[in-house]
C-alpha cells in the first residue's frame, strides 16, 4: 500500500511521469515512460505496442536518458534499446490508460497487470482548457514503453511522438442538425463492365510447311538431368549513332550446380565465358552514372544519383555503403573504396564495374575520355575502361543501380513518327513524356470529372454548388456487394462514387473556372484551378500516391472556401501544443458522422485573430480573408483519437511527388520511394500511407515511423500511416528462375527427364514444327502474333536445352528468326508507330477509332505489357540460343527490342523518348492495363499473369544482352508482384486483406481502383475468369501463384468444371495444375489420345506443356 501512495503522490506533481511497475523480482524494473526532463519543449520518443504477445528485456534502472528533439528537425521515433540488458525475459506488462471527463477535472487512471496481482494508480489534476476531451487509450497509445521487443510476426509498433505536456483546447464554431439522404449520403454505384467478343486465345490455325530437319526419337536412349544455366554478364553495349559510349568488353560467367561437368560449358558468341561456382566473384555494372557517398542509412539507393546528359561518375573518398542484413556473406560492411579521381572530362566517363571484396579493400580506377564515339546500331564499342583490384583473391559482392536508363537514344527509324489521334482534355500539359496509364488518367481525358484514386482518397473536379476539387474517403462499411452465388460469394465489391465529403473551393470560382493538369510523373501530378479571367488567382492541388493529406495551396487574391455535398454538422476550432507554430487546426464533422481534420497554414505565422474559417451555411466554410500562399490540409480523423497527435506533428508539410531509386547486390534489392516535400512540420516529416503489400517488404527502419493510424482503401485493404518522408524496402530476389521449367516445389533441384519422355517430346516437337512461323503470324494483331512467336520460342528452348538436338535447334532458330524479321522490318499486319504526342510505341490497328479494338486498344496504350511481353521473351530466347551458336542476333537487334522495353518500362527520367514506368505502378505493386480511357471506377487490370510475364521477359532479355540493371529490375518487379498479387488478385483461404465476401471467388476477376468484379471483358465463364490469371504458364508462374493457392483454386473452382470444358482453356487449366500436381498434369498431356486441336489454342504448344509438366513431375516425385 505504501508503494501505491508513493506513486500517487508523484503523479500529483508530474503530468507526464516516470513510473516503474514492480513485478515479483525486486531487481526487475519495467520502464513505461523513459523521460526525465520536464521541459515543455521535450518530445518523448518511444515505442508503444499493440497489446499482443511480447517479451520484456531486463534493464538497469539507471540506464535511461532523456531525449529531446528540435521541431524543425526530422524525428525518427526510434526504439530506446541502448541499455545494458541480459537475456532473461518475462511476459510483458499489459498496460491500459483511460481518460474520462468529470466536469472541470480529468481523472487519469493507469493500470498494470503483472503475472500476479493488478496494480492501479490514479492521478487527478485540474483542467483549465476551455473544453475537455474524452478519450480511451490502450497499450498502443501509451507513451514511452522502452525495451519491449516483439516476439511474434503479428506485433505492430506504434511510433510515439508526443509533447511531454501536450494540451488541446477547443471552441465550437458551428452546429447543425440538418438531415441528409440519398446521393448526399450514399453516392452512386457504377457496377457494369462492358463485355466484348474478342477472345484472348489464338484461334487462327498455324500455316503448315514441311521441314526436312527432324529429331530422331529413337536416338534418345538414356535419361537426362538438365543443369539449369543462369547467365550473368556485364554490360556489352550495342550503341547507336551519335551516342556516348560507356561500356566494357562483353564478358559472361555461366553458373552451374556443384556437380556439373565440364562438357556443359557453353561458349556465348562475342563473349569470354568461363564456368564458375556461385561463390566466385562476379561483375556488376554501375551505369550510366552513380554517385556514392558515405552513409549510415540501411537504404543505399538514396545515395545514388544520375546527373548530366552523359554518363559520368561522381564518387567521394572513402565510401561506406550499408547493405541489407539479409544479404549473403560477401557483403560490404565498412570503408572499402579508396579515393577515386574523376576529375577528367565527364562527357563519357563512367564507372563500369565494381568488385567488392568481403575481406579486403578494393581500389577502383576509372579512365575516361571526352572523345565522342559514333558506331552503328549493331556494333559493340568501348570508350572507357574501369578496373578493380584486391590485394588477394577473395569472394566479392557487387552493387547494381536498378534504374539505369536502358538507352537515351532516339527509337529506331523503322518506326514511323506520328502524333496520336487521341485528343487530350483542355489544359493538360507536361514538360516531358505524358503518362498514359497512371492513377490520374481520368483528369487528362474525357470530361475530366471522373475521380483520380490517390489511395486512401479519391479526388475529382467538382462542378456543383461549390466549384473546385472534391475529396472523398469511403470506409469498409460502405462497400457494396452483389451477385451472390450459391456458396455465398459476392460477384463484386464496389465503393460509392460522388460523395464530396470536402471540396477545395474559392469564393472567386464559378462555372467559368478552368482546370490545368501538369507536372505528371510516375507517382504524381498537379491540378491547378484558376479564375478564367485572371490566371494569377489559382489553387494548386498536388496529387501524390500515399499522401496522408489532401492539400490545397491558394495563390493570388483567391478567398479560400471549403464546401461539402454532405453538409457540415459541427465545426470546432482547436489548439494543440503538438502543432508547429502558426498552424490553425479545425475539426469538421459532417452530417454523415465522418470527422475530418483541417489544418490552415499561412506564409507567415497565422493566429486566430488574423485569420479564421467562418461558416456561411451547412455546405460552405469561408476564409475570413484572402491570403496569398495559404495552405489548407484535410485528412480523415483517425478512429483512435490518441493517434491524432501524429497528424498534428505532420501538418504543415505536404508531398509533391516521390522519386524511385534502388540497388541490388544480385540476391537482395533495396529500394525506396523518396518523397519531395514542401513546407515545415513539427516533426520534420509528414504523413504517408502504405498499402498492405508494402508491409511485406518494408525495411526494418520503417517500424519506427508507424503511427497506428489506419484508413481503408477502396479495393486494397487497410492502409497504415507512417510519419516519414520516404518508404523504404528490402526484398529477396528469386534467382532460381531462368529459362527452363521451374516451380516452388522444384526449388534448386535439377530437372530430370526419362528417355520415354524425351522420345515423346521429340515426336511432338517434330509435329508442331512442321510450320512456317512467318506465314502463321500473317494477319494477326500485335497480341496474337506475339503469342504465336513466343509459342515457338518455348519449343526452341525445349529442342535446344532439353532434347539438345543441334540440327533441329538450328532449323527452328532460322524459322523463328524469319518470322521475327517481319517485326524488325515493321511489316506486320499492324505496324508500330512512334507516337510523338504521348512518346510511346503503339499499334496502328486502331488508329482510326478509339472504339474498334482491332488490337485491344493498343493504339491508346491498353495492354502494352501484355502484347510486348510475348515479343520480348521470344527475342530473349532467340538471342540466347543464337549466341550459343556463335551468332550476334541479340546485339544486331538490341535497339529494336529495347524500344519495346522502354515503351512499357523505361526506368529513368533521363530517357526523354518514353514515359517512365508507363505500365507498372510501383506504389500499387502491379501494372494497370487500361490506357487513355475515362472510367468512373478508375484504372483496371484483367490479366495478372500477363503482367508478370512481361517482367519475366524483360529479366531474360536483360540477361541476354548483358544489362544487369534490366535483369535485376525484372527480378524486383516479380518479387513485388508476388506480394501484391497474393494480396489483391489471388485469394488464398488465409487472405486477410480483402473482405471475406469475395475471398471464396479465389481470384479478383477484373481489379479496378474502385471495384473488384469477378468477370472478364470477354465473358463470365469460370474458365475465362480463372484462366486469364494463369496464361501463359512459364517458369515464373509458380513464384507468383503459390502451390497452396493453386491447389485451393483447383479444388474449389476448377476441378468441378474441368471435365465439361473442351476448348483451348482446357490446356491452360491443366498446365496450371502442374504447379501443385505435375504428375496428373503430365498424364493429361502425354495421353496417347490427346487432341491438340481441341485442348490447345494456337498460342500454346503441347511440346512446352510436356516439357514443363514432365520435368517437374520427375524432379519433385
From Swiss-Prot:
Q: Where is this region: May provide specificity for triple-helical beta-glucan?
A: 1011-1013
Q: In the UniProt entry, which residues are flagged as the active site?
A: 863, 942, 946
The UniProt keywords, alphabetically, are: Carbohydrate metabolism, Cell wall, Cell wall biogenesis/degradation, Glycoprotein, Glycosidase, Hydrolase, Polysaccharide degradation, Secreted, Signal
Where does the record say this protein resides?
Secreted, Cell wall
Signal peptide from the UniProt entry: 1-16
Leading EC class: hydrolase
Q: Does the keyword Ion transport apply?
A: no
The record describes its post-translational modification as: Glycosylated.
Q: Where is the GH81 domain?
A: 400-1117
Spell out the residue ranges making up region: alpha/beta subdomain: 639-732
Q: What is this protein called?
A: Glucan endo-1,3-beta-D-glucosidase 1
- Organism whose genome encodes this protein: Saccharomyces cerevisiae (strain ATCC 204508 / S288c) (Baker's yeast)
Give the classification, highest ranks: Eukaryota, Fungi, Dikarya, Ascomycota, Saccharomycotina
Amino acid at each position: 500500500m505504501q508503494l501505491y501512495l508513493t506513486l500517487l503522490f508523484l503523479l500529483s506533481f508530474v503530468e507526464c511521469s516516470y513510473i516503474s511497475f514492480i513485478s515479483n523480482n525486486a531487481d526487475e524494473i519495467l520502464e513505461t515512460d523513459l523521460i526525465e526532463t520536464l521541459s515543455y519543449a521535450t518530445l518523448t520518443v518511444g515505442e508503444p505496442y499493440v497489446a499482443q504477445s511480447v517479451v520484456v528485456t531486463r534493464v538497469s534502472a539507471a540506464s535511461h536518458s532523456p531525449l529531446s528533439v528540435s521541431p524543425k528537425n526530422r524525428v525518427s521515433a526510434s526504439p530506446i534499446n541502448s541499455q545494458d540488458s541480459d537475456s532473461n525475459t518475462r511476459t510483458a506488462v499489459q498496460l491500459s490508460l483511460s481518460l474520462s471527463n468529470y466536469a472541470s477535472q480529468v481523472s487519469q487512471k493507469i493500470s498494470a497487470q503483472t503475472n500476479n496481482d493488478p496494480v492501479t494508480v490514479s492521478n487527478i489534476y485540474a483542467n483549465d482548457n476551455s473544453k475537455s476531451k474524452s478519450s480511451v487509450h490502450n497499450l498502443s497509445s501509451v507513451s514511452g514503453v522502452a525495451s519491449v521487443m516483439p516476439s511474434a510476426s503479428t506485433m505492430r509498433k506504434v511510433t510515439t511522438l508526443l509533447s511531454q505536456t501536450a494540451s488541446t483546447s477547443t471552441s465550437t464554431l458551428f452546429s447543425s442538425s440538418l438531415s441528409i439522404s440519398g446521393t448526399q449520403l450514399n453516392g452512386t454505384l457504377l457496377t457494369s463492365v462492358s463485355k466484348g467478343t474478342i477472345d484472348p486465345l489464338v484461334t487462327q490455325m498455324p500455316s503448315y510447311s514441311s521441314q526436312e530437319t527432324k529429331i530422331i526419337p529413337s536416338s534418345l536412349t538414356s535419361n537426362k538431368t538438365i543443369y539449369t544455366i543462369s547467365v550473368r554478364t556485364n554490360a556489352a553495349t550495342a550503341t547507336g549513332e551519335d551516342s556516348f559510349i560507356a561500356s566494357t568488353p562483353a564478358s559472361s560467367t555461366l553458373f552451374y550446380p556443384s556437380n556439373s561437368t565440364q562438357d556443359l560449358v557453353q561458349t556465348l558468341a562475342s563473349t569470354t565465358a568461363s564456368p564458375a561456382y556461385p561463390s566466385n566473384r562476379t561483375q556488376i555494372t554501375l551505369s550510366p552514372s552513380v554517385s556514392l557517398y558515405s552513409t549510415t542509412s540501411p537504404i543505399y539507393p538514396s545515395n545514388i544519383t544520375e546527373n548530366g546528359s552523359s554518363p559520368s561518375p561522381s564518387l567521394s573518398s572513402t565510401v561506406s555503403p550499408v547493405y541489407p542484413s539479409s544479404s549473403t556473406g560477401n557483403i560490404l560492411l565498412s570503408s572499402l573504396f579508396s579515393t577515386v579521381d574523376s576529375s577528367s572530362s565527364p562527357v563519357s566517363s563512367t564507372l563500369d564495374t565494381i568488385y567488392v571484396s568481403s575481406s579486403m579493400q578494393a581500389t577502383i580506377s576509372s579512365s575516361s575520355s571526352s572523345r565522342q564515339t559514333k558506331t552503328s546500331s549493331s556494333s559493340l564499342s568501348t570508350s572507357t575502361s574501369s578496373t578493380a583490384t584486391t590485394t588477394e583473391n577473395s569472394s566479392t559482392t557487387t552493387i547494381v543501380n536498378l534504374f539505369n536508363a536502358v538507352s537515351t537514344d532516339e527509337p529506331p527509324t523503322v518506326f514511323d513518327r506520328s502524333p496520336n489521334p487521341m485528343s487530350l482534355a483542355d489544359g493538360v500539359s507536361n514538360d516531358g513524356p505524358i503518362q498514359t496509364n497512371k492513377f490520374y488518367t481520368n483528369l487528362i481525358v474525357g470530361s475530366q470529372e471522373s475521380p483520380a484514386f490517390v489511395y486512401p482518397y479519391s479526388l475529382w473536379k467538382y462542378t456543383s454548388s461549390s466549384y473546385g476539387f472534391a475529396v472523398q474517403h469511403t470506409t469498409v462499411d460502405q462497400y457494396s456487394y452483389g451477385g451472390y452465388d450459391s456458396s455465398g460469394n459476392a460477384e463484386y465489391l464496389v465503393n460509392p462514387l460522388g460523395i464530396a465529403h470536402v471540396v477545395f473551393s474559392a469564393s472567386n470560382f464559378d462555372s467559368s473556372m478552368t482546370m490545368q493538369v501538369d507536372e505528371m510523373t510516375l507517382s504524381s501530378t498537379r491540378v491547378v484551378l484558376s479564375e478564367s479571367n485572371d490566371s494569377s488567382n489559382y489553387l494548386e492541388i498536388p496529387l501524390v500516391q500515399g499522401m496522408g493529406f489532401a492539400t490545397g495551396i491558394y495563390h493570388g487574391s483567391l478567398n479560400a472556401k471549403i464546401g461539402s455535398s454532405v453538409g457540415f454538422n459541427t465545426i470546432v476550432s482547436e489548439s494543440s501544443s503538438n502543432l508547429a507554430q502558426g498552424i490553425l487546426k479545425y475539426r469538421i464533422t459532417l452530417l454523415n458522422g465522418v470527422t475530418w481534420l483541417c489544418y490552415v497554414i499561412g506564409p507567415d505565422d497565422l493566429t486566430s485573430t488574423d485569420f479564421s474559417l467562418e461558416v456561411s451555411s451547412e455546405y460552405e466554410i469561408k476564409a475570413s480573408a484572402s491570403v496569398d500562399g495559404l495552405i489548407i490540409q484535410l485528412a480523415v480523423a483517425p478512429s483512435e483519437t490518441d493517434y491524432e497527435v501524429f497528424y498534428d506533428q505532420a501538418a504543415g508539410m505536404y508531398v509533391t511527388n516521390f522519386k524511385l531509386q534502388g540497388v541490388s547486390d544480385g540476391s537482395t534489392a533495396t529500394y525506396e520511394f523518396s518523397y519531395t516535400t514542401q513546407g515545415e512540420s513539427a516533426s520534420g516529416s509528414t504523413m504517408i500511407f502504405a498499402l498492405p503489400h508494402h508491409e511485406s517488404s518494408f525495411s526494418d527502419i520503417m517500424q519506427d515511423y508507424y503511427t497506428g493510424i489506419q484508413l481503408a482503401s477502396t479495393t486494397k485493404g487497410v492502409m497504415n500511416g507512417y510519419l516519414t518522408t520516404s518508404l523504404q524496402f528490402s526484398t529477396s530476389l528469386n534467382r532460381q528462375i531462368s529459362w527452363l521449367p521451374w516451380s516452388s516445389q522444384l526449388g534448386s533441384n535439377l530437372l530430370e527427364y526419362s528417355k520415354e519422355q524425351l522420345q515423346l517430346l521429340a515426336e511432338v516437337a517434330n509435329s508442331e514444327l512442321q510450320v512456317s512461323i512467318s506465314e502463321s503470324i500473317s494477319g494477326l494483331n500485335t497480341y496474337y502474333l506475339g503469342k504465336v512467336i513466343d509459342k515457338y520460342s518455348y519449343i526452341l528452348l525445349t529442342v535446344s536445352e532439353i532434347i539438345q538436338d543441334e540440327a533441329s535447334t538450328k532449323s527452328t532458330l532460322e524459322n523463328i528468326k524469319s518470322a521475327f524479321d517481319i517485326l524488325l522490318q515493321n511489316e506486320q499486319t499492324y505496324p508500330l508507330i512512334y507516337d510523338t504526342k504521348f512518346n510511346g510505341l503503339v499499334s496502328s490497328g486502331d488508329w482510326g477509332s478509339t472504339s474498334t479494338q482491332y488490337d485491344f486498344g493498343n493504339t491508346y496504350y491498353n495492354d502494352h505489357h501484355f502484347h510486348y511481353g510475348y515479343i520480348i521473351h521470344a527475342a530473349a530466347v532467340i538471342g540466347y540460343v543464337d549466341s550459343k551458336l556463335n551468332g550476334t542476333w541479340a546485339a544486331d537487334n538490341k535497339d529494336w527490342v529495347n524500344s519495346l522495353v522502354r515503351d512499357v518500362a523505361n526506368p529513368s527520367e533521363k530517357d526523354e523518348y518514353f514515359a517512365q514506368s508507363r505500365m507498372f505502378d510501383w506504389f500499387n505493386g502491379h501494372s494497370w492495363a487500361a490506357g487513355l480511357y475515362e472510367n468512373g471506377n478508375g484504372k483496371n487490370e484483367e490479366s495478372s499473369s500477363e503482367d508478370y510475364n512481361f517482367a519475366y521477359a524483360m529479366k531474360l532479355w536483360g540477361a541476354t544482352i548483358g544489362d544487369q540493371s534490366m535483369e535485376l529490375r525484372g527480378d524486383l518487379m516479380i518479387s513485388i508482384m508476388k506480394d501484391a498479387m497474393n494480396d489483391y488478385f489471388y485469394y488464398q483461404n488465409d487472405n486477410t486483406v480483402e473482405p471475406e465476401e469475395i475471398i471464396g471467388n479465389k481470384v479478383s476477376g477484373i481489379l479496378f481502383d474502385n471495384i473488384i468484379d469477378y468477370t472478364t471483358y470477354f465473358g463470365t465463364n469460370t474458365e475465362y475468369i480463372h484462366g486469364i490469371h494463369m496464361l501463359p504458364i512459364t517458369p515464373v508462374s509458380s513464384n507468383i501463384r503459390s502451390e497452396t493457392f493453386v491447389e485451393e483454386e483447383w479444388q474449389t473452382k476448377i476441378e468441378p468444371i474441368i471435365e465439361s470444358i473442351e476448348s483451348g482453356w482446357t490446356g491452360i487449366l491443366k498446365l496450371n495444375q502442374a504447379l501443385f500436381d505435375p504428375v496428373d498434369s503430365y498424364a493429361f498431356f502425354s495421353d496417347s489420345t490427346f487432341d491438340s486441336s481441341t485442348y490447345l489454342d494456337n498460342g500454346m504448344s503441347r511440346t512446352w506443356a510436356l516439357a514443363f509438366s514432365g520435368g517437374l513431375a520427375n524432379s519433385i516425385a
